[in-house]
Amino acid sequence: MDITHFGHSALLVSLRGGTGARAGEGGAGESDTTRILIDPGNLSEPSLTHLTDLDAIAISHQHPDHAHPPYLAELFAHNSEAAILLEPQTAQALSDNPETSRFRERFTPLAPGQRASVGPFPVTVTAAGGTHATIHPSIPPVGNVALIVEAAGEKTLVHTGDSLVPHPEIVGADVLSFPLVAPWSKMHETIDFLRIVKPAVAFPVHDRVASAEGRAIYLKQSRAFAPEECEVRDWPADAEPGQGRTLSF
C-alpha cells in the first residue's frame, strides 16, 4: 500500500494486494491497482484535481477543508467511473451545492456500519463513528465518519476525519492517519487517542492549520508520548512540488 499526502487531510491510497510491486517495479500493473482519494479539501494541493484513474473518492465529512466543491467537481468529472462514497450529511450538502449537484446520482451515502467494495483489486471501505468533534457547543454538530480501508494481503488503513473518538472498530489499526492539530482538539486528547487505538504505525494529517514551527511541536509531542508499540512517521520532505509525499507500507 502506498499513501500519498496532498496536504492537510487529502490522501491518495493505492493498493496492490500485497504483491510488493511498486510503481515501476514490475509485477502487478496499474490495472491491478485500486486507487482511492480521501478528503480533498481547500487546504490541499490544487494539483490533486488533475488525478485520474481513481476507483473511489471518499469523504469523511462536509467541512470545506475535507470536501471542497470546486475541487470535487473537477475530480468527479475527470473520474467518471469512480465510486463516490460520502458521509450521509455530506451527500446531502453536495447534492444541494450547484457545483456538485449534477453528480448526485453517483453519490453513495456511507453511514456508520455501512461498507462499499471498490476497484479492480477488491477493496472494502467501511464507515465508523458518526459525529464531528465539538468545536464549541454553540456550533451545530455535523456528521463525520472514520473510513476503514481493507483489502486482502494489505494492511488496514484508518482515516478518522475530524474525530478523536477511539471507536472499537478502529482499535489496533495497522496504519492510522491522525489529526495532528485542530480547532477542536487538545494535545492530551491526541496522545490519549493514540494510546487507546494503539496503531502499529501512525502518520499526521490535518496539519495546515499550524505553522511549520507549530507543526513540529505537535509532531514531537505525539512521537514522545505515543505508545511504545506505535511508530509515528512523518511524510518525506524531498517530494517534488505538487506531486504529494508518499509513504509505503
Residue locations for each model-derived region?
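Binuclear metal-ion centers of metallo-dependent hydrolases, dominated by the metallo-beta-lactamase
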Residues: T4, D96-G119, I191, R195-F249
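Conserved N-terminal glycine/acidic-rich loop preference
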Residues: R35-L37, S47-A67, A93-F121, S222
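Redox-cofactor binding/interface segments in oxidoreductases and associated redox assembly factors
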Residues: D39, A58-I59, T126-A128, F178, ...
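Active-site metal-binding motif and surrounding structural segment of the metallo-beta-lactamase
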Residues: N42-L86, G172-S177
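Catalytic metal-binding/acid-base residues of hydrolase active sites
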Residues: H63, T90, G129, L164, ...
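Short internal beta-strands
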Residues: E81-Q89, V201-H206
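Active-site-proximal segments of metal-dependent phosphoesterases and phosphodiesterases across multiple
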Residues: A173-T190, R195
